[in-house]
Design a protein with these regions (language model features):
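Short acidic, Gly/Pro-enriched loop/turn segments at secondary-structure junctions
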Residues: 366-373
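Surface-exposed, charged/polar loop-rich segments
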Residues: 361, 374-376
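Extended ligand-binding clefts on enzyme/binding-domain cores
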Residues: 381
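Substrate-binding/charge-relay-adjacent region of secreted/lumenal peptidase catalytic domains
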Residues: 2-94, 102, 107-362, 386-452, ...
């Protein structure tokens, strides 16, 4: 039997607040997502450096070119298939363009294959999940081939970033809700209905009712867009019946995009809420040769600090691929303030923290006619809700934010004290995403949603 070594960055610890409740059923069937290295990595890095520097002579890659030149090599995929066969695992899907292989097998088979112990945990908010501690182990011939092994542990990785606005209180400062069309007018959204384009939306739970969507778009006087549900890793459109839960996020995402660009096709990718499911969903959208989304919207995320190094690297690599293809990825920056709900200290939200993502924050505004009269950062939510943002602890400052670094240095000198740059890769740009109305489960709601966006990079 080949000697196995820990996969760098794969170490897991016990989730804070979790309780071990026993071993996993060794006969339980699970799926595991394996991500492989990229061919011609140095050449790809050189291309990305030109893109990040804003070189006007660089054109986005086509999906065909990306797959041929920068996908996983046939030899690397063959090595993973041989490893799977040696351990009785089944190859469900091998995607050279996405550099991924999806494996299926029993808990016992995966424990033996990767030398891990899978156990059941109970968490007071996340519920029951399959977890592991320590590192994933791979043999010598896969050590430089495999970048990540995800799905052995299926703890919930993200939460939806939206909040239902509480009822109006006349004693407080005047508040008003806006329809997406009103917001588009206030922010001078460009003309056009998105015809010929596709917007991908990533969802990690819940679902939508087509009747709710039809009613909502009819109330706005706009045609209902074409909405497609795409199943990823056996997840699907499954409404929970609770508009205050993930259904509210799913419905709101579709309604905002559909109202502003009704001519665009909307592909909603439903995936399990785990690091494997999240990454695979975005990867499937990026490499979707049928729907070909040119914009991907993500309203889910979690503190950067709870991701393993391998999952951060794998996810960021997918987002980098999107940038190479000219696909704009927008993600909510969070709604739990500077802590991102992670307890003590400052934390930023991922995937908004990636340098290849357009991070979207929220504001509160007042308007008169077609003009914004007052706008401030959203910072007054119930139970401590506030817009997220900050400085990434995982990604260094990209070239296109050097101007921010200089502004911060000048500000520090003018105050004769040090100052931290308020923008990093964690918030490459903060976009307003203000209160707007939506309809879910036959009920109208006004939501403070920090992730309403659609548009070209």
């Amino acid at each position: 039997m080949a000697t196995k070594h820990p996969l760098p960055g794969s170490e897991r610890t016990v989730e804070q607040g979790s309780k071990l409740i026993g071993d996993c059923d060794p006969s339980e069937k699970i799926e595991v997502f394996v991500m492989l290295r990229r061919q011609r990595q140095a050449q790809f890095d050189a291309l990305m450096s030109r893109i990040e520097a804003g070189d006007p002579n660089v054109e986005p890659l086509s999906r065909d070119t990306l797959a041929k030149d920068y996908g996983a090599s046939p030899d690397d995929i063959a090595k993973v298939k041989a490893f799977a066969a040696a351990h009785g695992l089944t190859v469900v899907r091998a995607d050279p363009a996405a550099r991924s292989v999806l494996l299926s097998g029993t808990v016992e088979q995966f424990q033996n294959a990767f030398e891990v112990k899978l156990e059941k945990y109970q968490h007071h908010t996340a519920g029951e999940f399959r977890g592991r501690t320590g590192a994933v182990n791979v043999p010598d011939d896969l050590h430089d081939v495999v970048e990540a092994v995800l799905g052995l542990d299926n703890r919930p990785q993200a939460r939806p970033h939206f909040r239902i606005r509480p009822p109006f209180r006349p004693a407080r400062t005047h508040q008003a809700s806006f329809t997406p069309l009103e917001l588009a007018s206030l922010y001078k959204f460009p003309d056009g209905d998105g015809g010929g384009q596709c917007v991908g939306i990533i969802e990690l739970g819940g679902g939508y009712d087509p009747a709710d969507l039809s009613s909502y778009f009819a109330s706005l006087g706009v045609p209902s867009p074409t909405v497609k549900s795409v199943s990823v890793d056996q997840a699907r459109n499954e409404p929970t019946g609770d508009p205050n839960g993930p259904d509210g996020e799913v419905t709101l995402d579709i309604e905002i995009v559909g109202a502003i660009v009704p001519g665009a096709t909307i592909a909603v990718y439903f995936a399990p809420n785990s690091d494997a499911g999240f990454i695979d969903a975005v990867s499937r959208a990026v490499h979707d040769t049928v729907n070909k989304p040119s914009v991907i919207s993500i309203s889910w995320g979690g503190p950067e600090s709870i991701w393993t190094s391998q999952s951060l690297k794998a996810f960021n690599s997918v987002l980098q691929t999107a940038a190479a293809l000219g696909v704009t990825v927008c993600a909510a920056s969070g709604d739990s303030g500077s802590s991102d709900g992670a307890g003590a200290g400052d934390h930023v939200d991922f995937p908004a923290a990636s340098p290849y993502v357009l991070a979207c924050g929220g504001t509160s505004l007042s308007a008169s006619g077609t003009s914004i009269t007052h706008e401030v950062v959203w910072n007054d939510g119930p139970q401590g809700g506030a817009g997220g943002g900050g400085v990434s602890g995982a990604f260094s400052l990209p070239a296109w934010q050097e101007a921010c670094r200089l502004r911060c240095r000048k500000a520090a000198r003018s105050r004769s004290q040090s100052a931290a740059c308020p923008m990093s890769r964690a918030t490459p740009r903060r976009l307003p995403a203000t209160p707007c109305s939506s309809r879910a489960h036959k009920r109208w709601s006004a939501a403070r949603a920090r992730s309403r966006r659609c548009g070209p990079r």
